[in-house]
């Protein structure tokens, strides 16, 4: 049954009249906006309102944001749901001229956009503009967003903390924002109040994001009067004042780790006693959004005890947009950690709501984006394990990071003829449309965006869409296969991926399904089977994306020419993404060949790597030619990696020089079965680290060679070193700075060169360098800094080889050992194998503490070697387990310990063939590449009712005693 509140045609007419009287400038509420849109649609169609009246009803059956249209009755679960129903009705009138049945109950309860304030000069033109905010929230409402998070003070001293820019707290008159007058402060508060209230009028829940309550170490304060003693009481009073002055603020998002500016040992007390208390004491319900990254022990308990509604969020794919699913495994702090834990009683919901943060701040900063299939796949993952939804960072969300001076737009002043928008966010209409409409209704018809392409580009609309869709795959794949830093410090839209040795050293961020260059080489050398994608497949993807984009752009250009304004402002982005795809296709292969050469001394791989980096440089030169003078030279969207493509040219040029040097070393010395680079001490690389890997910690060491310093003393575990320490001196090369290794620095001055000969060790006398080897006889080449070499033949004893330095003074840059025996023939590349049919009936429900069997059917299985199950609790802190089964009967038995009531079960299959390659199921290219089975405590059935007592023959009948 539906409980309905009828809004009569009189209400409809009255509301429309009221809106007309107001000039249509503002919406009194979501329902009024929806009604106004319906009226505009009737007018556009020339239909009389009195003959097309509608009835609106509240429904208790639909969710709050749901709606249905039946005849001329529109039902909604709330005013926002009714607004969505009216917007759908308006679209139907425009498209069809009449209403058609429709019903949507959104699977994602929260659908949010997040925006950051970072630059006073750039924000001056829109932040205080009421027309801007009305247009923005109208766009969000049309696209079915229901949340807007405006974040202040994100890793910057700008507006940190923001409270003194809004209010003066009588108890703390000494706390002031520097250079802000009372009039400016009042204007700031009034603007915040207007933004929050206007959001509400369009059905948008406004969230106030406060990420720093004090500046971080090394920043210049923009606020005076704060001390460690008063910051807590001041924050309590100020936040409370802001919330009371701005009733449209529905929730407050807090960052609570060290990046908040609050020292770790004070964070729990600060938030518990002041910030959370301010929310509780405001006098109305305000939701707490807690960013859960690196919380101190006790902070979650404090939030749960704050007696306000609590939401907890974490990152979907680090601080970038990768593939359309949370990675099966990644750095735990850059994913959902253990936040999807369920309460002890499985029928009880969590004490908090969980939602996903889709960070685009690292990757999708400037260029246009829109791929409906990607969005459909992503939004299907958002409800995983009861999550409430998502918020996402659109392009330009951090424009002007760090309050850098200067005005700049998407294009340079000379290219303003390409500007087809009034507000810059209008340029990204497809991004907003797809993420909003498809998260609200994943079954939305493609005509919603295809009609818009046709309206904007006419007969070329389909080709512009195809170009955009294919170009949009490029950045997501770069993030998935090559993410040098999960933080937003590297900008893949303009970054060439770092120096070639760094590129080859970086792991994929989707390492469960993509092999690193090192892993791929070892798999091939050791004959180890793996279904993971290789660089060859990745490069093929990049070149396919580029080709499809190029072809669609050419077709659109033939129709639109150079005179179409929106096309002229769209095509450059597509061209940039095409070239980025070509570049990374080349660099993927260069890195793959280079790592293979380092393992095998295969000279064809070395020359192939040289060819690929040369090709990559040519592509980057095209990028510079295309973008120079087109996009601004001083673009800043993050704390590092600012500037322009032309600022990065030195890096691919250095790659070419690096490979030239490697080829010259090969020609001069031949293969290095064991290679040692003599120089100063360096740090050991940390396995699986993204900042302390080999290319960073040993950037002054020739790749493929082991670093040797005077302190490198032989031990069995290391397998090489000096027999005795002492008497040795190093002539060291400096490390290449991290920012140059990763191609972040704009003016690199310390790029690597001459690594083997540029540093050295010198000594006097016959010191011995010992190496554990496989083989008997070796030629030892002691390389001098001038490039000449002392050669000798040495023999190993029991797997140990001693190379004696000459008597007298000596100085060497390195040591190469060449086995007299021919090198082993490596495993050939796997031949292609036809993919078999794979079937699995995934259980929807698993009972906790009970064993379960999972069956995978594979047929035909004649080319399948084994089937492997990977499984763990849905917890990024848990370790993946694996078990194998024959393909003829791939049945896996999980024990009772594997079905923990606190966690749902996450699992996927790897099918390995006889060629050493294979397939994953589910397929990462088509679906979320793992299953999530709900684990629930089995509730025993209620006991049967007691049996009726047997009839008593001596008892009198109901009518009384028998006479």
Predicted regions and their residues:
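Glycan-association/targeting regions that enable binding to alpha-glucans and other polysaccharides
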Residues: 820-963
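C-terminal non-catalytic alpha-helical accessory regions
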Residues: 394, 398-400, 404-651, 655-666
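Bacterial N-terminal signal peptides
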Residues: 13-24
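Short solvent-exposed strand-capping/beta-turn motif centered on an Asx-Ser/Thr pair
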Residues: 140, 681, 859-863
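Catalytic-core regions of glycoside hydrolase
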Residues: 48, 94-96, 146, 158-162, ...
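Mature N-terminal, pre-catalytic/accessory segment of carbohydrate-active enzymes
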Residues: 26-154, 310, 317, 535-671, ...
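Feature activates predominantly on carbohydrate-active enzymes
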Residues: 29-37, 41, 62-66, 70-229, ...
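Compositionally biased, intrinsically disordered or flexible polar/acidic segments
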Residues: 669-822
């Amino acid at each position: 049954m539906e409980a309905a509140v009828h809004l009569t045609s009189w209400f409809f007419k009255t509301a429309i009249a009221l809106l007309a009287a107001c000039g249509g400038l503002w919406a009194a509420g979501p329902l009024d906006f929806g009604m106004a849109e319906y009226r505009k649609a009737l007018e556009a169609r020339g239909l009389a309102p009195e003959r097309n009246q509608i009835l609106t009803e509240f429904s208790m059956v639909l969710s709050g944001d749901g709606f249905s249209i039946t005849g001329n009755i529109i039902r909604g679960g709330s005013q926002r749901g009714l607004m969505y129903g009216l917007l759908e009705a308006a679209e139907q009138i425009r498209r069809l001229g009449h209403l058609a049945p429709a019903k949507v109950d959104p699977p994602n309860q929260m659908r949010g956009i997040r925006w950051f304030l970072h630059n006073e000069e750039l924000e001056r033109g829109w932040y205080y503009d009421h027309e801007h905010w009305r247009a923005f929230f109208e766009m969000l409402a049309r696209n079915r967003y229901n949340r807007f998070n405006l974040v202040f003070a994100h890793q910057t001293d700008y507006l940190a903390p923001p409270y003194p820019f809004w209010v003066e707290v009588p108890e703390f008159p000494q706390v002031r924002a520097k250079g802000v007058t009372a009039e400016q402060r009042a204007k700031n508060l009034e603007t915040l109040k207007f933004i929050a209230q206007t959001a509400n009028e369009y059905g948008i829940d406004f969230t106030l994001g406060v990420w720093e309550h004090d500046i971080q170490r090394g920043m210049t304060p923009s606020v005076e009067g704060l001390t460690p003693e008063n910051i807590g009481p001041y924050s309590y009073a100020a936040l409370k004042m802001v919330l009371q002055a701005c009733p449209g603020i529905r929730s407050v998002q807090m960052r609570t780790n060290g990046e908040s500016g609050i020292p770790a040992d004070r964070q729990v007390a600060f938030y518990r006693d002041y910030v959370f208390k301010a929310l509780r004491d405001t006098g109305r319900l305000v939701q707490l959004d807690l960013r859960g990254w690196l919380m101190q022990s006790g902070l979650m308990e404090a939030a749960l005890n704050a007696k306000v509604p609590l939401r907890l969020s974490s990152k979907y794919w680090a601080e970038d947009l990768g593939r359309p699913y949370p990675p099966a495994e990644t750095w735990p702090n850059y994913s959902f950690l253990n936040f999807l834990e369920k309460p002890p009683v499985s029928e009880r919901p969590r004490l908090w709501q969980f939602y996903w943060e889709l960070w685009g701040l690292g990757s999708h900063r400037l260029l246009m984006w829109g791929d409906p299939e990607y969005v459909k796949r992503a939004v299907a993952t958002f409800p995983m394990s009861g999550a409430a939804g998502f918020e996402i960072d659109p392009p330009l969300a951090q424009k002007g990071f760090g309050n850098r001076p200067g005005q700049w737009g998407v294009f340079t002043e000379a290219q303003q003829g390409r500007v087809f928008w009034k507000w810059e966010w209008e340029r990204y209409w497809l991004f907003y449309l797809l993420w909003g409409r498809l998260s609200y209704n994943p079954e939305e018809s493609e005509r919603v965006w295809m009609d818009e392409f046709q309206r904007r580009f006419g007969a070329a609309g389909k080709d512009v869409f195809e170009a955009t869709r294919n170009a949009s795959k490029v950045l997501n794949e770069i993030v998935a296969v090559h993410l040098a830093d999960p933080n937003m410090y590297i900008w893949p839209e303009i970054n060439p991926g770092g120096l070639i040795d760094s590129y080859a050293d970086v792991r994929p961020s989707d390492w469960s399904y993509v092999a690193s260059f090192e892993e791929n080489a070892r798999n091939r050398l050791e004959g180890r089977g793996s279904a993971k994608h290789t660089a060859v497949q990745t490069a093929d993807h990049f070149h396919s994306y580029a080709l499809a984009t190029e072809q669609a752009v050419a077709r659109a250009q033939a129709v639109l020419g150079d005179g179409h304004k929106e096309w002229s402002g769209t095509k450059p982005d597509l061209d940039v993404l095409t070239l980025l795809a070509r570049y990374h296709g080349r660099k993927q292969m260069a890195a793959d060949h280079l790592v293979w050469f380092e393992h095998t001394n295969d000279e064809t791989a070395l020359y192939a790597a040289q060819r690929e980096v040369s090709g990559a440089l040519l592509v980057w030169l095209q990028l510079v030619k295309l973008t120079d003078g087109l996009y601004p030279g001083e673009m800043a969207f993050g704390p590092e990696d600012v500037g322009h493509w032309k600022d990065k040219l030195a890096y691919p040029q250095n790659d070419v020089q690096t490979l030239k040097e490697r080829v010259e070393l090969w020609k001069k010395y031949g293969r290095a079965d064991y290679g040692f680079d003599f120089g100063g001490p360096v740090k050991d690389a940390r396995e699986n680290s993204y900042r302390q890997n080999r290319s960073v910690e040993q950037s002054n060491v020739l790749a493929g060679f082991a670093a040797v310093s005077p302190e490198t003393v032989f031990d069995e575990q290391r397998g090489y070193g000096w027999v005795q320490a002492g008497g040795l001196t190093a002539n060291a090369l400096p490390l290449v700075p991290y920012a140059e290794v990763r191609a972040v620095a704009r003016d690199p001055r310390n790029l690597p060169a001459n690594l083997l000969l540029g540093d050295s060790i010198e000594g006097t006398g016959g010191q011995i360098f010992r190496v554990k080897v496989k083989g008997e006889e070796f030629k030892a080449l002691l390389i001098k800094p001038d490039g000449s070499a002392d050669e000798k033949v040495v023999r190993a004893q029991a797997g140990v080889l001693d190379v004696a330095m000459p008597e007298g003074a000596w100085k060497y840059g390195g040591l190469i050992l060449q086995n007299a025996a021919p090198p082993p023939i490596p495993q050939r590349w796997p031949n292609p194998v036809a993919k078999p049919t794979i079937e699995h009936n995934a259980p929807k429900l698993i009972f906790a503490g009970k064993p379960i069997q999972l069956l995978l059917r594979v047929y035909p299985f004649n080319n399948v070697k084994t089937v492997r199950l990977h499984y763990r609790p849905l917890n990024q802190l848990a370790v993946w387990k694996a078990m194998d089964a024959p393909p003829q009967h791939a049945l896996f038995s999980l024990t009772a310990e594997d079905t923990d009531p606190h966690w749902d079960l996450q699992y996927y299959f790897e099918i390995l063939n006889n060629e050493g390659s294979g397939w994953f199921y589910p397929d990462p290219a088509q679906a979320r590449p793992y299953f999530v089975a709900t684990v629930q405590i089995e509730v025993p059935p209620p006991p049967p009712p007691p049996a009726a007592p047997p009839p008593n023959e001596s008892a009198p009948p109901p009518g009384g005693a028998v006479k």
